Regions:
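Non-heme di-metal
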Residues: 1-181
């Protein structure tokens, strides 16, 4: 995190970052544990893992907000792109080299495969940031097929409607329709 806050350079900043990381990791672990419990027929235990995961998510959000890690959408997209860039250019590259040096060639290959996905994530976030900055999220220079994410209403045009004529949801529910089947 590169933003300067009242905690910058303090042990409290380190503690907040550790609390955020710990709560975030716990949330993920509990969702994985819930999947196992569900597969083994323990619905209540799965539900309790998920409930606790939701609690951990909120705890993490408290600490992340305290660190001023949440901005507006453009700031968040830039932050996400920068994070993904670090992951594919530095983190996973270093992990792969170390794994290879230590004889874990299959793991090194997997680190490199994930790095390629992280590169795609960066590109996607940067494209979305461009759309936000250029006011091109809900308006394009050519005709597109727009779909309401709430009710499925289809509109053909250069711009998504302000309000869905079918379900009255706002423009924010529209996306460019894509069929990938």
């Amino acid at each position: 995190m590169s933003k300067t806050t009242k905690y910058t350079g303090t042990q409290t900043e380190k503690n907040l970052m550790a609390a955020f990381a710990g709560e975030s990791q716990a949330r993920n672990k509990y969702t994985y544990f819930a999947s196992v419990a569900k597969k083994q027929g323990f619905e209540q235990i799965a539900a309790l893992f998920l409930k606790t995961a939701d609690n951990e998510k909120e705890h993490a959000k408290l600490w992340f907000k305290e660190l001023e890690g949440i901005g507006d959408t453009a700031e968040n997209l830039l932050s996400a792109a920068e994070g993904e860039n670090y992951e594919w250019t530095d983190m996973y590259d270093g992990f792969a080299k170390t794994a290879e040096e230590e004889g874990f060639k299959e793991l090194a290959a997997r680190f490199r495969l994930v790095a390629a996905v992280e590169k795609h994530h960066e590109e996607r976030y940067r494209a979305l940031l461009h759309n936000v900055e250029m006011a091109e999220v809900f308006a394009k220079s050519e005709v597109k097929v727009w779909e309401c994410r709430n009710c499925g209403h289809i509109v053909v045009g250069e711009k998504a409607p302000e309000i869905c004529p079918t379900c009255n949801h706002p423009q924010s529910y529209f996306e460019i329709h894509a069929e990938n089947y």
